[in-house]
Amino acid sequence: MTRNKGFTLIELMVVVAIVGILTAIAVPSYLQHVIKSNRAAAESFMLQLSNLEEQVILDMRSYVAVSANANFPNAPTAASPGLNTTVPSSVSKYYNITITLPTAANYLITATPIGSQLTGDTKCANLTLDQTGAKGISGTSSATDCW
């Protein structure tokens, strides 16, 4: 009697179960890694903006407020201080970046998550950075966990 070659239904179901378990573990872990990576890109750009603001205050004696993502002012002139930068696409796809001036001597850089980052990053939510270097968040976690 010859034996049939191939897989039995039980063997196939065991493989499907193993693949399902691995997928259930790997996909959420991967998504969290992507969220952290997007957050790190925004944080890096916020630190870059902070450095540019400090250069502007030294040159122009005033900070620059920016309310539009990717439309930061051009290079500083005598009439108009500027930051001469644009928001990288790796940041603008996931965050809106704004710079507000609560007082003449202060600025607050805010990264507000949008799209998939908004729904996936509820722990940290909005990221903030001020002129003293103080880092903050508006989510349920702590600033040290998010920064």
Q: Which sequence ranges carry the predicted segments?
A:
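Short, charged low-complexity linear motifs
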Residues: 11-20, 47-50, 77-82
